[in-house]
Amino acid sequence: MINFNQAAENNKKPILTELKRILVEPGALLEIGSGSGQHVLYMAELLQDVIWQPTEMAVNLSALAHNLTSSRIHNILQPFELEVGKDWPNGEYRYAYAANVLHIMSEKLLPSIFKELKEVVQAGGIAVFYGPFKYNGYFTTDSNKRFDEWLRKKSSEAGIRDIEMVLAEAHNSGFTLIEDIAMPANNQLLVFSRQ
């Protein structure tokens, strides 16, 4: 597998446990930033009523497509290029899912991701974000603080986001937080409903 990611391997089971409970209706799901495809390959097989649309930035798209080629899982569509802050292809999805995306992309793009989701997630649909967050300006653990420092050394645009800022941008685009679930390794699963 090209671009294998150990963190994705470690978190796929606990995330799936929650998604089985959240994604109860059949429908299409837009995965933002599919990375190596480890999540879609694992989860689509076990959530057969959900049609998965993997996406990735242009620079990573060929690796994702390569990893998905050998898959015979019927509910995974061909991946396409998607970048927050640029035009998204038309589509209508019941669900959207992004794991470890918000702390990698620029904070300036937070308004864009929710505005773009509003255009593609149907009313009453669900958007799910997995990753670490700060609460009231504070890291939840020392390890998250160290992780944030490491991220910012790699890119000045990256960093763990304040939950309050995420919630405000979500609200501005018609998304309401319905669950904030504590996950292993100091991460959260944020579940939003689109009005």
Question: What residue spans do the PLM features occupy?
Answer:
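Class I SAM-dependent methyltransferase Rossmann-like catalytic core
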Residues: 1-25
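Class I SAM-dependent methyltransferase SAM/SAH-binding core
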Residues: 30, 38-86
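Conserved glycine-rich SAM-binding loop
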Residues: 35
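A short acidic, Gly/Pro-enriched loop at the edge of an enzyme's catalytic core
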Residues: 88-96
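A short, conserved alpha-helix within the catalytic core of class I
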Residues: 105-117
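Conserved beta-strand signature within the Rossmann-like core of class I S-adenosyl-L-methionine
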Residues: 124-133
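Short alpha-helix
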Residues: 157-174
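Core SAM-dependent methyltransferase catalytic element
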Residues: 175-195
